[in-house]
Amino acid sequence: MKTLVIVVHPDVENSVINKRWIAELDRYADKFDVHQLYKAYPEEKIDVLAEQKLIEQYNKIVFQFPFYWFSAPPLLKKWFDEVLTYGWAYGSKSGYKVGDKKIGLAITAGIDADEYTPHGIYKYTLQELTAPFELTFNYIRADYRSFYAYYGIERNSTEEWIEKSVPPYVAFLDAL
């Protein structure tokens, strides 16, 4: 079964890594389906039933986004609030439709990895900063598989650095 990659980037056309990752996934259409939230909902009016039906079709789901302001783009929070509803995602006999689905995060972080340490400039690890995602996935009984992060694009946006991100990203998706 294919993996659904939900891309949440407000300006993917001007992105560096996320745009490259999407291009790579397009090469493997037999393994991955890409769903871009900002392209699907430019006015940010989410079709909740369509999103729920989409999620129900997959056993493996990855949310891909740039990490800025120490979180995800706002449309992802809105998506969680509107799509992961009581009675569907949790809390009743018919709930937990996401239960047991393998879920992961694919994150691009402009800042270097060593800055996301207790001794770095931001004092917290990326694992600590993404804890709300893990808690959400645990609450809806999904099988959270952690995250893949690629750091440092702000300091190094060379073609070599970008291409270096692709094999481990695809390997992360394959291993989900």
Go through each PLM region and give its residues:
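A short beta-strand-loop structural module common to alpha/beta enzyme folds
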Residues: 31-44
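Structural beta-sheet core signal
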Residues: 5, 34, 63, 103-107, ...
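Glycine-rich phosphate/pyrophosphate-binding loop and the adjoining helix
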Residues: 22, 26, 130-176
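N-terminal beta1-alpha1 ligand-phosphate binding loop
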Residues: 1-32, 165, 169-170
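Generic recognition of short, well-ordered alpha-helical segments
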Residues: 16-20, 46, 74-78, 160
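Glycine-rich, highly charged phosphate/nucleotide-binding loops
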Residues: 42-58, 165-168
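Helix-loop-strand module that forms the ligand-binding subsite of alpha/beta enzymes
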Residues: 49-134
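Residue-level detector of anion-binding/catalytic polar loops
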Residues: 31, 61, 143
